Structures are given as C-alpha cells and as structure tokens.
Amino acid sequence: MPTQTREPLHMPPPPGLSVIRPHHATIGLLALLGAAVAAAPARAQFLDATAAAAGPGRGDVRTLKYKVGLVVTAEGGPCTGLYATLPVPDEWPEQKVRIVAEDVSPAVRNLRYRTLPGGVKQMVVEIPELPAGKQARAVVTFELERAAIVVPDDTAGLRIPEKPDRAIKAHLGTSPYIETRDPKIAALAKTAGKGLDGWRKVEAIYDTVRDKVEYRNGELKGARRALADGWGDCEELTCLFIAMARAEGIPARTVWVEGHCYPEFYLVDATGQGWWFPCQAAGTRAFGAMPDQLPILQKGDNFRDPDRPGKSLRYVSEFLKGATVKGAGDPQVEWIREGG
C-alpha cells in the first residue's frame, strides 16, 4: 500500500475523523509507558505558583482526560507491515501528562514513543499482520493537568535576547506559511515597534496584527496573504504575529491546542533568564497570558519527521504506511483524539 499522511485542514484534524492509516503495536506495559511519560525534560517542569516576578504566572489548573490512538480494519484482504505514527500530548511548563489507561489489541506487537527534533512526541504503532476483516486498536488515555497562564508581575525589565542559544534561535527563521523575510511584513513589524523595546515592542506588534487582520474563517493562506487580504482565522493571525516578531529578532512559535492555535514569544530578564509567553492572536484579547486550558498538542511550526524525509512540517500529523503485496487489503483507519 502507498504511504499515507493526513495533514491538518487548516487546523489539526478533528477527533473522530476516519482516514486510512496504520498503527503501532504495543505490549501492555502501562507502568513502563507511564514512566517514560513521567521522565519529563527540564523544559517540562510545571509552572511554579510562586514563579519569578518577570516569568509567566500560573493560574487555575484544570485536570482532564484525553484519548489518543487509532482503530484499523483490514478491508478487501489481509494487511501486513502496518506502521503508524501519531502525535500525543507532552509535558510543558503549563501542562503535566501521565498515562492512566491503555486499550491495545493482541495484533499490535509493538508500541513505543519517540520525540522528534523540536519537541513533538509521537506514539509509534506496528502491526505485522492483520487478517482480512479483522480489526486492531491502540488507544491510550492520558490525564492532563493544564494550567492557565497569567501576566507576569513585572514586565518592565524583559527584553529581546541578544544572543539566543541554538534551541531558541531555531524560532527566528522562516517556517511553512510564516514568511519572516517578506518585505511588507518586515516593514510593518519595524514600523509597529519603532522606538519600543522588550515587552512593549512585542505588544505593539500584537496589536498591529489584530488591527490589520480581521478574524474570519477561511482557507489556509499564511502570513503574507493574510496581511494582503486583511483577514484570516487563528492560523493566519498566529502566522503573521510570528513572522513580524521574528523579523524584529523576537523568537516566536506556534502553540497547537485542540481545535485552535496561538503564538508564544520569548523574552529574557536582566540576568539572561528567559521565558515563553503566550498571546491570543484571534478572539478575545489576551497578551502575555492564556486563560484557555485546552490540551496542548504541539509547540513549534517547522518540524522534520524521519518518516517524511525532505518535508518541512508546520504541524506533525498522523502517518501510515504498509507493505505493498499482491492481493493485500486496504487498511481503513479511524484516528482517535477525544477529550478536552
């Protein structure tokens, strides 16, 4: 069978959408998998309720269940060599994650997790053989603790990093649909932030984006076209804010949550300590804060997936491939993403 991928149709695909995909196998080692998730990197330390005055503050914490996985059926014949990857929630300063349940069929021989460069966590599922008409499933239930973010107590000393490290510098270039080097975008960013620095400069860019681009649903078109057309949805406003921020040397990235996205920007204090701050590009104004507590799926907008070589991905979607064998069936897959 040919390789199949599902890219988000303007936003991450909605839960319950049936598409053709393979899945990764798993042995029911819940304790082992839970330990893997619990082994959070330093970036994932949960926000302290008494954080530094210049850092993001932690608001209310919401606990929720979130299911991720797939159900695959071999139609028209047997399927072999099924291999699937799908993104799963990971830990971030405002989100804690742990596995609380798993539902895995015997046909699934291996299930594991991996983290791509840039920080996207994937579930990898392998099904060596699936007889005609049979069904296999691999569904994992996560428990998320998702904190709202409040504006720092002291923003006056926050500034744009002069010498960001390699990880932060990665959020200064171009990304799919984020045309950082577009002359009109760069000129608008320069005008918006003229005479300002740090927090005030980023806020001026934020207000300019919301003033120049009307929030309206439509096709995915990116920052350049959104500015030219004067309208776009949450992705366009997010793309334009990120492009303008990066044009002024301000690291910025996309935060993908269930059914929505928004940008984050990075500033440092006088000691060089840095933080990511969110803002709501579309909808109710929220700068440097995020009242929404939707499940965070990914952060970033320029990923590389070894299963999709040569492609720059703004969002890492589900992926399936299987062996091409004469008389083989067609794997019909329902991707599961429920909760929030």
List the model feature ranges, each with a label.
Residues 146-147, 212-213, 231, 258-261, ...:
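Solvent-exposed loop/turn segments at secondary-structure junctions
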Residues 7-28:
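Bacterial N-terminal signal peptides that target proteins for export
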Residues 236-316:
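Hydrophobic/aromatic-rich core segments of domains that either
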Residues 38-44:
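Boundary at the C-terminal end of the N-terminal hydrophobic targeting segment
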Residues 26-36:
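Bacterial N-terminal signal peptides
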Residues 136-137, 144-229, 240, 316-340:
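Secondary-structure boundary elements
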Residues 44-149:
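Intrinsically disordered, low-complexity N-terminal segments that are enriched in acidic
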